């Protein structure tokens, strides 16, 4: 439409610049400052475009090409703005629809998963019950037990029967079994709809039923209030008041009053029943097995018999809606017939349902139940009101909708609180990380003394007493045997030491590694490609250079990526700091010069202060050194109350000023680098603690000992969370080294049995 109007305007301007008629576009110059109406008797009439003579005053201004272009631009801008607004609204609505669809799909998936899980748990519960029955009675639950007790009935004299058919547990099992079969044939949702429909119809006609029902003999007729009983809540209150008045008139009014109120509000009893634990359930099973002697004459039913009869009637009434599903709301309610019609109808329904349950048990393999007709005619239930139906089934349905909107979840059972608390504790334990062996490294010929992980790849470097270092690519694992740990072959062997290799550490970015041995030398190695062929020729460029200066075996190495410095401790009694990247003399400083603390055993850089290094000694001392000052800064209190014990390894916490030491006296001590005080001390193993490693996040500590065990400790509460037996003893030695991967969920251990193991 806009294009037609613009074309008409251009045509009229090109022809004779006639005034704007009624059939043309509005004057674009109307937006000019002189926007007031033109002087004259009035605006242009309807006949302005039909050839009528103009008025005595001047007409509208003639059209011009700039005005037409301005009008077109204005209309185009308005159209684009509306289009953008429409697109934004459309995108917003599409996003909302997509969000709602995704939420609905997620809820359906969650419901399906929960149903599957609960079905699995119910199946496991059935298996456990069968196992318990076999352990207690020595026989399996089979169909051969169905007629075991039928021959024991005696026709003359008192009758013996097993009270199995009326117990709440039996009816509960029957309900669950019938619900399962109904769900398999696809009647679950339909049945729930019918039940909700009938509940609404009953509540809607409550006033009519109250007026039509016959009053109970001996009880006053209840007259409706001024407002009538319009809701389910008023109906329930009215029914409870009538029942209290009826029960108060009898002999045992006080006893029956309490029972009647509880029966009238059955969900209180259900809560107690659901909260019973497994021991109570087992007691009820034993109670069902007890034989009760019934005299030939009819007895007054006790409270327990009434409860059992109530449960049986509830079970029958539970399935009354199956027959009323086709009739709809207008079908007669079987519950009304029990009190207004034939009194034997309840008995016939109960016998019919027991026959159905017996047939289903033949198919499902459930234990048989003995059916004995009750003595005498069943009495009317004391808690049935004048309406003729029981409220046991419908009370929970009227509260918040009940089962109406549950769908597939309607047939699920609820566990008691004790089982729930156990499940919560078990779920907490399930979240704890459990380390399991994944790789076994078998290529060394003697004990492995040290380990070092690659910083970013799944690779491990081992140093052994056989004089070699070996590089392992853990991504190239092969399975040697079925159900066995994966074996890994080394991709490269480093050979240059003249004697056992005692220490190894990774350099910056894992491009270089450094090893120290019994030959008093420190070798710098270039890490080869992890995807190299293990059978390639020897590459002499792998050995970078040698750091010399120590006079005895090098027992410990540590590298600081921050300061690019290498620290070493030797049996000659010194700790040296090296610059491994220097081409000239690379030893920067040496301490202690006097050897007052003895022979160092381990060295480590502190994580919080890169310019500080901590060293441990055989004398049990732990000294903190300042690299900038080149002197001892602080002596930590690492000696225990029982006397000095050799420290085998010292490590630093990755995020706190904390030093951790492993001692020969089976202890682990935590020391504060700021004060030098001992923060915590504990006995960690059954033998000497030989090695330590802290994970990069500072959550747990791993320790190894000569008692052949690895233990993982929580650094929050200093408790052991896992113990692993991974190595065997050799010459009274077991585990020599442990390590944690800097960036992956891998830990490793090495021992005197020439094996290294990796855990995930």
UniProtKB/Swiss-Prot annotation:
The modification Phosphoserine is found at residues 53, 206, 223, 276. GO terms for cellular component: cytoplasm; dendritic spine; FAR/SIN/STRIPAK complex; GABA-ergic synapse; glutamatergic synapse; membrane. Calmodulin-binding scaffolding protein which is the center of the striatin-interacting phosphatase and kinase (STRIPAK) complexes. STRIPAK complexes have critical roles in protein (de)phosphorylation and are regulators of multiple signaling pathways including Hippo, MAPK, nuclear receptor and cytoskeleton remodeling. Different types of STRIPAK complexes are involved in a variety of biological processes such as cell growth, differentiation, apoptosis, metabolism and immune regulation. Part of the core of STRIPAK complexes composed of PP2A catalytic and scaffolding subunits, the striatins (PP2A regulatory subunits), the striatin-associated proteins MOB4, STRIP1 and STRIP2, PDCD10 and members of the STE20 kinases, such as STK24 and STK26. Interacts with CTTNBP2NL. Residues 165-182 are annotated as: Calmodulin-binding. CDD domains: WD40. It is found in: Cytoplasm; Membrane; Cell projection, Dendritic spine. Residues 7-35 have a biased composition (Low complexity). It holds the Pfam family Striatin. Residues 332-346 have a biased composition (Basic and acidic residues). GO terms for biological process: negative regulation of hippo signaling; regulation of modification of postsynaptic structure. It comes from Mus musculus. WD repeats lie at residues 443-482, 496-535, 549-588, 595-635, 642-681, 684-723, 730-759. This is Striatin-4. The keyword Cytoplasm applies. Transmembrane segments: none annotated. The name 'Zinedin' probably originates from the name of the famous soccer player from Marseille (Zinedine Zidane). Disulfide bonds: none annotated. Belongs to the WD repeat striatin family. The gene is Strn4. Residues 1-65, 210-233, 272-346 are annotated as: Disordered. Keywords: Calmodulin-binding, Cell projection, Coiled coil, Cytoplasm, Membrane, Phosphoprotein, Repeat, Synapse, WD repeat. Residues 43-54 have a biased composition (Gly residues). One of its GO terms (molecular function) is protein-containing complex binding. SMART domains: WD40.
């Amino acid at each position: 439409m806009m294009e037609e109007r613009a074309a008409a305007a251009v045509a009229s301007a090109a022809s004779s610049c006639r005034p704007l008629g009624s059939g043309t576009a509005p004057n674009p110059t109307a937006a000019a400052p002189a926007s007031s109406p033109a002087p004259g008797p009035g605006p242009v009439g309807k006949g302005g475009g039909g050839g009528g003579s103009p008025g005595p005053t001047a007409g509208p201004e003639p059209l011009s090409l700039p005005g037409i272009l301005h009008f077109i631009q204005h209309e185009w801008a308005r159209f684009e703005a509306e289009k953008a607004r429409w697109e934004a609204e459309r995108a917003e609505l599409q996003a909302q629809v997509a969000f709602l669809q995704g939420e609905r799909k997620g809820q359906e998936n969650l419901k399906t998963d929960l149903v599957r899980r609960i079905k699995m748990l119910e199946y496991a519960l059935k298996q456990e019950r069968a196992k318990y029955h076999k352990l207690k009675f020595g026989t399996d639950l089979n169909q051969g037990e169905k007629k075991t007790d039928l021959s024991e009935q005696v026709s003359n004299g008192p009758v013996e029967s097993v009270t199995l058919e009326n117990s709440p547990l039996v009816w509960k099992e029957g309900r669950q079994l019938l619900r399962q079969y109904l769900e398999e044939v696809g009647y679950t949702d339909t049945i729930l709809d019918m039940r909700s429909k009938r509940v609404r119809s009953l509540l809607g006609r409550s006033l009519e039923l109250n007026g039509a029902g016959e009053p109970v003999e001996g009880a006053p007729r209840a007259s409706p209030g001024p407002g009538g009983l319009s809701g389910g809540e008023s109906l329930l209150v009215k029914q409870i008041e009538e029942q209290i008045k009826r029960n108060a008139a009898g002999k045992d009014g006080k006893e029956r009053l309490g029972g009647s109120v509880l029966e009238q509000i059955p969900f209180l009893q259900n809560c107690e029943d659901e909260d019973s634990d497994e021991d109570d359930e087992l007691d009820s099973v034993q109670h069902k097995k007890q034989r009760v002697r019934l005299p030939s004459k009819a007895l007054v039913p006790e409270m327990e018999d009434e409860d059992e009869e109530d449960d049986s009637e509830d079970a029958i009434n539970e399935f009354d809606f199956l027959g009323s599903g086709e009739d709809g709301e207008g079908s007669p309610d079987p519950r009304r017939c029990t009190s207004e019609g034939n009194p034997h109808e309840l008995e016939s329904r109960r016998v019919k349902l027991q026959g159905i349950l017996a047939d289903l048990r033949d198919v499902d393999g459930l234990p048989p139940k003995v059916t004995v007709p009750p003595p005498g005619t069943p009495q009317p239930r004391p808690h049935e009101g004048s309406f003729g139906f029981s409220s046991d089934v419908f009370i929970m349905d009227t509260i918040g909708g009940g089962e109406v909107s549950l769908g597939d979840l309607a047939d699920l059972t609820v566990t008691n609180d004790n089982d729930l608390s156990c499940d919560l504790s078990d779920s907490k334990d399930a979240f704890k990380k459990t380390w399991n062996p994944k790789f076994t490294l078998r290529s060394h010929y003697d004990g492995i003394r040290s380990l070092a992980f690659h910083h970013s790849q799944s690779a491990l470097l081992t140093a052994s007493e056989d004089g070699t270092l070996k590089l392992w690519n853990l991504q190239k694992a092969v399975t040697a045997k079925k159900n066995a740990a994966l074996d890994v072959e080394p991709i490269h062997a480093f050979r240059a030491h003249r004697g056992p290799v005692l220490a190894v550490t990774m350099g910056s970015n894992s491009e270089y590694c450094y090893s120290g041995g019994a030959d008093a030398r420190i070798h710098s190695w270039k890490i080869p490609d992890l995807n190299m062929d293990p059978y390639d020729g020897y590459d002499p460029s792998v050995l970078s250079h040698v750091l010399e200066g120590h006079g005895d075996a090098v027992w410990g190495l540590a590298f600081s990526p921050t300061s690019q410095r290498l620290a070493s401790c030797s049996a000659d009694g010194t700790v040296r700091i090296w610059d491994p990247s220097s081409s000239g003399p690379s030893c920067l400083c040496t301490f202690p010069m006097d050897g007052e603390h003895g022979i160092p055993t381990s060295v480590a850089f502190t994580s919080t202060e890169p310019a500080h290094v901590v060293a441990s000694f055989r004398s049990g001392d732990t000294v903190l050194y300042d690299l900038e000052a080149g002197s001892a800064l602080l002596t930590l209190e690492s000696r225990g109350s029982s006397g000095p014990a050799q420290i085998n390894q010292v490590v630093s916490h990755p995020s706190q000023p904390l030093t951790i030491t492993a001692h020969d006296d089976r202890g682990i001590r935590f020391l504060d680098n700021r004060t030098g005080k001992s923060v915590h001390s504990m006995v960690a193993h059954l033998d000497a603690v030989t090695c330590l490693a802290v994970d990069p996040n500072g959550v747990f500590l791993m320790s190894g000992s000569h008692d052949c065990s690895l233990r993982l400790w929580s650094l929050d509460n200093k408790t052991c969370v896992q113990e692993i037996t991974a190595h065997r003893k050799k010459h009274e030695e077991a585990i020599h080294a442990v390590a944690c991967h800097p960036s992956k969920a891998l830990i490793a251990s090495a021992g005197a049995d020439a094996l290294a193991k990796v855990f995930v």
